[in-house]
Amino acid sequence: MGVPMGKSLLAPLTFLALASCCFAAYRPSETLCGGELVDTLQFVCGDRGFYFSRPASRVSRRSSRGIVEECCFRSCDLALLETYCATPAKSERDVSTPPTVLPDNFPRYPVGKFFQYDTWKQSAQRLRR
Protein backbone atom coordinates (compact mmCIF):
# COMPACT_ATOMS: atom_id res chain seq x y z
CA MET A 1 0.00 0.00 0.00
CA GLY A 2 2.87 2.33 -0.42
CA VAL A 3 2.98 5.19 -2.88
CA PRO A 4 4.94 4.40 -6.05
CA MET A 5 8.32 6.12 -6.31
CA GLY A 6 7.38 8.10 -9.46
CA LYS A 7 4.25 9.64 -7.92
CA SER A 8 6.01 10.59 -4.69
CA LEU A 9 8.56 12.66 -6.60
CA LEU A 10 6.00 14.28 -8.90
CA ALA A 11 4.73 16.88 -6.41
CA PRO A 12 8.16 18.14 -5.26
CA LEU A 13 9.49 18.25 -8.83
CA THR A 14 6.42 20.17 -10.01
CA PHE A 15 6.85 22.65 -7.17
CA LEU A 16 10.55 23.03 -7.94
CA ALA A 17 9.85 23.66 -11.64
CA LEU A 18 7.19 26.28 -10.88
CA ALA A 19 9.38 27.98 -8.28
CA SER A 20 12.33 28.25 -10.65
CA CYS A 21 10.13 29.77 -13.37
CA CYS A 22 8.70 32.32 -10.96
CA PHE A 23 12.09 33.33 -9.58
CA ALA A 24 13.46 33.79 -13.10
CA ALA A 25 10.48 35.97 -14.07
CA TYR A 26 10.87 38.23 -11.02
CA ARG A 27 14.59 38.73 -11.36
CA PRO A 28 14.87 42.48 -10.61
CA SER A 29 17.78 43.35 -12.85
CA GLU A 30 20.57 42.06 -15.04
CA THR A 31 23.80 43.22 -16.59
CA LEU A 32 23.82 44.41 -20.19
CA CYS A 33 26.95 45.07 -22.24
CA GLY A 34 27.89 45.94 -25.80
CA GLY A 35 25.40 45.23 -28.55
CA GLU A 36 22.92 43.76 -26.07
CA LEU A 37 22.91 47.06 -24.16
CA VAL A 38 22.42 49.08 -27.36
CA ASP A 39 19.63 46.78 -28.58
CA THR A 40 17.86 47.02 -25.23
CA LEU A 41 18.14 50.82 -25.20
CA GLN A 42 16.74 50.99 -28.74
CA PHE A 43 13.82 48.82 -27.68
CA VAL A 44 13.11 50.78 -24.48
CA CYS A 45 13.55 54.28 -25.93
CA GLY A 46 12.08 53.67 -29.39
CA ASP A 47 11.98 56.73 -31.66
CA ARG A 48 13.19 59.04 -28.89
CA GLY A 49 16.77 57.79 -29.06
CA PHE A 50 19.12 57.61 -26.09
CA TYR A 51 22.28 58.97 -24.48
CA PHE A 52 25.27 56.99 -23.22
CA SER A 53 25.60 59.50 -20.39
CA ARG A 54 22.60 61.16 -18.79
CA PRO A 55 21.70 64.74 -19.73
CA ALA A 56 22.85 67.30 -17.15
CA SER A 57 19.30 67.84 -15.87
CA ARG A 58 18.91 64.16 -14.98
CA VAL A 59 22.25 63.52 -13.29
CA SER A 60 21.95 62.85 -9.58
CA ARG A 61 24.40 64.46 -7.20
CA ARG A 62 25.71 61.14 -5.92
CA SER A 63 26.78 59.71 -9.26
CA SER A 64 27.62 60.82 -12.75
CA ARG A 65 28.49 57.40 -14.18
CA GLY A 66 27.52 56.50 -17.71
CA ILE A 67 25.23 53.70 -18.73
CA VAL A 68 28.11 51.30 -19.38
CA GLU A 69 29.33 51.66 -15.78
CA GLU A 70 25.81 51.29 -14.46
CA CYS A 71 24.51 48.44 -16.63
CA CYS A 72 27.58 46.49 -17.73
CA PHE A 73 29.65 46.47 -14.53
CA ARG A 74 26.63 46.55 -12.21
CA SER A 75 23.07 45.39 -12.75
CA CYS A 76 20.42 47.75 -14.08
CA ASP A 77 16.66 47.67 -14.44
CA LEU A 78 14.03 49.20 -16.74
CA ALA A 79 13.64 52.39 -14.68
CA LEU A 80 17.36 53.09 -14.93
CA LEU A 81 17.41 52.39 -18.68
CA GLU A 82 14.55 54.85 -19.22
CA THR A 83 16.57 57.65 -17.59
CA TYR A 84 18.95 57.45 -20.56
CA CYS A 85 16.19 57.93 -23.16
CA ALA A 86 16.21 61.26 -24.97
CA THR A 87 13.19 63.52 -24.75
CA PRO A 88 11.57 63.96 -28.15
CA ALA A 89 12.12 67.31 -29.83
CA LYS A 90 8.87 69.06 -30.62
CA SER A 91 8.62 69.82 -34.30
CA GLU A 92 6.65 72.60 -35.99
CA ARG A 93 4.26 70.01 -37.36
CA ASP A 94 3.52 68.50 -33.96
CA VAL A 95 -0.18 69.02 -33.34
CA SER A 96 -0.49 66.74 -30.32
CA THR A 97 -1.14 69.73 -28.04
CA PRO A 98 -3.71 72.29 -29.14
CA PRO A 99 -2.75 75.98 -29.19
CA THR A 100 -3.69 77.96 -26.12
CA VAL A 101 -7.02 79.70 -26.58
CA LEU A 102 -8.24 82.34 -24.17
CA PRO A 103 -11.74 81.78 -22.80
CA ASP A 104 -14.50 84.18 -23.82
CA ASN A 105 -14.79 85.61 -20.31
CA PHE A 106 -11.06 86.36 -20.07
CA PRO A 107 -10.67 90.08 -19.22
CA ARG A 108 -8.96 92.05 -21.95
CA TYR A 109 -7.29 95.22 -20.80
CA PRO A 110 -6.08 97.81 -23.28
CA VAL A 111 -2.35 98.36 -23.26
CA GLY A 112 0.08 100.95 -24.52
CA LYS A 113 -0.96 104.17 -26.24
CA PHE A 114 -4.50 102.91 -26.83
CA PHE A 115 -4.99 102.58 -23.10
CA GLN A 116 -4.09 106.25 -22.65
CA TYR A 117 -6.51 107.22 -25.43
CA ASP A 118 -9.36 105.26 -23.81
CA THR A 119 -8.66 106.88 -20.44
CA TRP A 120 -8.71 110.33 -22.03
CA LYS A 121 -11.94 109.50 -23.90
CA GLN A 122 -13.66 108.35 -20.68
CA SER A 123 -12.55 111.52 -18.87
CA ALA A 124 -13.87 113.69 -21.70
CA GLN A 125 -17.26 111.94 -21.61
CA ARG A 126 -17.52 112.50 -17.85
CA LEU A 127 -16.77 116.21 -18.29
CA ARG A 128 -19.52 116.57 -20.91
CA ARG A 129 -22.18 115.25 -18.56
UniProtKB/Swiss-Prot annotation:
Residues 1-24 form the signal peptide. One of its GO terms (cellular component) is extracellular space. One of its GO terms (molecular function) is insulin-like growth factor receptor binding. Residues 53-65 are annotated as: C. Residues 66-86 are annotated as: A. Interacts with MYORG; this interaction is required for IGF2 secretion. Interacts with integrins ITGAV:ITGB3 and ITGA6:ITGB4; integrin-binding is required for IGF2 signaling. Belongs to the insulin family. The insulin-like growth factors possess growth-promoting activity. Major fetal growth hormone in mammals. Plays a key role in regulating fetoplacental development. IGF2 is influenced by placental lactogen. Also involved in tissue differentiation. In adults, involved in glucose metabolism in adipose tissue, skeletal muscle and liver. Acts as a ligand for integrin which is required for IGF2 signaling. Positively regulates myogenic transcription factor MYOD1 function by facilitating the recruitment of transcriptional coactivators, thereby controlling muscle terminal differentiation. This is Insulin-like growth factor 2. It comes from Neovison vison (American mink).
